[in-house]
Structures are given as structure tokens and as C-alpha cells.
From Swiss-Prot:
SUPFAM superfamilies: Glutamine synthetase/guanido kinase. Belongs to the glutamate--cysteine ligase type 2 family. YbdK subfamily. GO terms for molecular function: ATP binding; glutamate-cysteine ligase activity. This is Putative glutamate--cysteine ligase 2.
Length: 399
């Protein structure tokens, strides 16, 4: 089969941000997505790409940007839509928040959005779909030529653990500490067409693989392929779907800057005739697990021999490499948030710090709500990175 790719302008951006609807008093999720969307028809109407959309659960609303040239445009677009949504939510006693999972609520208590697509998904996947009470962020980055797409997807898979660890925000599942930095990656990754992208050779191999899945009845549309990093032919982008739910617009800007800078780097290298790195599938899968379990304290595999380095060190090196590109793109300050997170802690660390200092899970929910309203992480004595020896530690991560 032939799959048309609509080329983008170089490194344009689009972001999808899945938000939790939280009751202001109880901290539990509210099943009011349909009511809020009906209250804001100008933002959720019949146009093909409205900025507010349903997700699987009635406790979730997705905020979507238009096509943006810069990270600043992404943040402005998201903030404007969130401001309108916040107004409507305030009138119903609802707060907005974002994390990969809700720390307390159980998937069994959720209502599903009224959608034929979601009904078919639940019928097909059953328990796997019913328990997807998860929240993520997807970043689209434009690619100029279809023949560049698969090499860029393969190269980006080297940084899959970096994307996940920086945004890991789901240590709790149904009121319990899972011991993971990201339980969301396990829950969503259980779907048969989710997980790390397969290592393909070129666009023709991607077309052949999609044709095989369609012929086999595994999927009915290529939109049902939910890889952690995937081509999006209609939008002319590479879509990075590995990010856990991101609590603040400042950190969303970081994710967009990191994504845009990497894709721009790989485009430039391809233009100069370089061959991009393409790690083996076993390395990508193993590294994803390490980031899922240990977050920023993981040791990641860097070659086929199994050599490992601390993920934190690799991130600092990556920042140094990407800095000139980020400056040209105008997103250097957003990229610098990576260093801030390495200093004060990713969301999973900030959440656990609250419990470690005597708080309860309702306090974690309240902190997520406050961070979302502030637009930036709460940094202070009650937050910060955990001691690696207390959450698995690099020595175990590299075993």
C-alpha cells in the first residue's frame, strides 16, 4: 500500500495535553468532560481540529494546539485555551491538573466518553482499554520529507528513556505506590499496538508493515498504531507519545523544546549525508523499562555490548549538544528546564517527597493542582529529587 506523507515546514510543532478534571473539595476525579465541552462549543465544536477534545474517560479533556513555529507559540496557545477551560471548570467546582495517573482514583469508578470509536476500542481490548485511566502529552514535530521520517523515528528511540524519565509523573496507581517512576507507561504499553516503535529500514518498510497489520485485521486504521514514537503521515510529523502527563506548562515547553531540537538536529545530519543512529529493539525496550522503574536514576544502555551510563549524565551531555540548535530555534530557555528538573526533581520525585515528609495522597493531588495553576513546578524544601538508594538506585538499574 502507498501511504502519502504531507511534508511540513521544518520543525513546526503541535502539542496535545491530556488534563484531569479534579473535584475542588474531595480531590477525586469528576466525570464532567461532556458538560464542560458542551459549555464551550466554540472550542470543542465540529471543526476538524478543535482545541478541546474528548478522551476515553469522562474525567479527561485534551487540550490541543494549532500548528506552531516556536515553543513560545505552543505555550501561549495552550495557556489561552486552558484559561477558557479554567473559567468554565471554576463554575462547577472543578480544578485542572495533570500527571500520568491520578494518585487516588480507580479506573473501575470512571465513566466512558460517548463515542463510537471508544466503544469499539473497549469492545476489542476489554480490560486493557477499561483500565486506561492515564494521562499523557504528545508532541508533533514537522518533518520536511517522508524519506527522513523513519530514520528520525529510529534515532529518536535512542532518547525514549530521556523523554520518559524527565516527565515521569505516575508513581501512584489506585491509591498505592507502585515502586515505579511511571506506572502509566506500563498500563498504556499493554495495548497490543503500543510500545516502542519497531526498527524499520525506510518508508517503504513502514508502508509494508501497515499493510500487513491491516490485512491481518490487527488494526482497521493506521491511527490505531500507538507506538511511543510514530510517523503521522496526515500531519506530516513525527509524534513523540512517550511523555507522561506533564503537570505544568513550563515543563510542557521543555518537552516541546527537547523534541524540536532533536528533530532539527537529525534533519540537519540527514541533509549533510550522515547516517543516523538506530539502536537495536532490545536496547530500546530495556532502556524504556529502566526509565519506567528508576526514572532519572536509571543507567541506560548506550551500545550493543551492553555498556551503560547514568541517565542524568547523558542528559547533561545532550543539553550541551543541543544548545546551539535550541538557540537558533529560540527555545534555549525552555531546553534549560531539563537542568532545572535534574536539580529539583521530576514530578514522580516531587510527589513522593510529599509522602515521605508525612503527607497523604490528597496532599499530592492538591500539589498537582497548585502546580498546574502556577504554570511551574513548586520548588522548595518539601520537594526535590529522591536519594537514589531509596528508590532502586543506579546500581540496580544497571544490573
Amino acid at each position: 500500500m502507498t501511504i502519502e506523507f504531507n511534508p511540513s515546514k521544518r520543525a513546526t510543532l503541535g502539542v496535545e495535553w491530556e488534563l484531569q478534571l479534579v473535584d475542588r473539595d474531595s480531590g477525586h476525579l469528576r466525570q464532567d468532560a461532556q458538560k464542560l465541552l458542551e459549555e464551550l462549543p466554540e472550542l470543542s465544536g465540529a471543526e476538524s481540529n478543535p482545541p478541546l477534545r474528548h478522551e476515553l474517560m469522562q474525567s479527561t479533556i485534551e487540550v490541543v494546539t494549532g500548528i506552531c513555529e516556536t515553543v513560545d507559540e505552543v505555550k501561549e496557545d495552550l495557556s489561552a485555551t486552558v484559561a477558557r477551560l479554567t473559567q468554565a471548570a471554576d463554575g462547577r467546582g472543578i480544578e485542572l491538573a495533570c500527571a500520568g495517573t491520578h494518585p487516588i482514583d480507580d479506573w473501575r469508578d470512571q465513566e466512558f466518553a460517548p463515542s463510537q470509536r471508544y466503544s469499539e476500542l473497549i469492545e476489542q481490548m476489554q480490560w486493557l482499554a477499561r483500565r486506561i485511566l492515564t494521562f499523557g502529552v504528545h508532541v508533533h514535530v514537522g518533518v520536511t520529507d517522508r524519506d527522513k521520517v523513519i530514520p528520525i523515528v529510529n534515532a529518536l528511540s535512542r532518547y525514549l528513556p530521556h523523554f520518559l524519565a524527565l516527565t515521569a509523573s505516575s508513581p501512584f496507581w489506585s491509591g498505592h505506590d507502585t515502586g515505579l517512576a511511571s506506572s502509566r507507561s506500563i498500563v498504556f504499553g499493554a495495548l497490543p499496538t503500543a510500545g516502542p516503535p519497531p526498527r524499520l529500514a525506510h518508508w517503504g518498510a513502514f508502508e509494508e508493515y501497515m499493510d500487513t497489520l491491516l490485512r491481518a485485521g490487527t488494526i482497521t486504521s493506521i491511527k490505531e498504531v500507538w507506538w511511543d514514537i510514530r510517523p503521522h503521515p496526515e500531519f506530516g510529523t513525527v509524534e513523540i507519545r512517550m511523555f507522561d502527563g506533564i503537570p505544568t506548562v513550563r515543563e510542557v515547553g521543555m518537552a516541546a523544546a527537547l523534541s524540536q531540537s532533536l528533530v532539527q538536529l537529525f534533519e540537519q545530519q540527514l541533509d549533510r549525508g550522515y547516517r543516523l543512529p538506530s539502536p537495536s529493539s532490545w536496547v530500546v525496550t530495556d532502556n524504556k523499562w529502566r526509565a519506567t522503574r528508576y526514572g532519572l536514576d536509571a543507567r541506560i544502555i548506550i551500545d550493543e555490548r551492553g555498556s551503560t551510563v547514568p541517565l542524568r549524565d547523558d542528559l547533561y551531555e545532550l543539553l550541551h549538544e543541543l544548545r546551539p540548535i535550541a538557540e537558533r530555534l529560540g527555545c534555549a530557555e525552555d531546553l534549560d528546564v531539563v537542568a532545572e528538573i535534574l536539580h529539583y526533581g521530576a514530578s514522580y520525585e516531587r510527589q513522593r517527597a510529599i509522602i515521605r515528609q508525612g503527607g497523604v495522597l490528597k496532599d499530592v493531588v492538591d500539589a498537582l493542582v497548585k502546580e498546574f495553576r502556577a504554570g511551574a513546578p513548586a520548588v522548595g524544601s518539601s520537594h526535590g529529587r529522591t536519594d537514589p538508594s531509596r528508590n532502586g538506585g543506579p546500581s540496580h538499574a544497571g544490573a
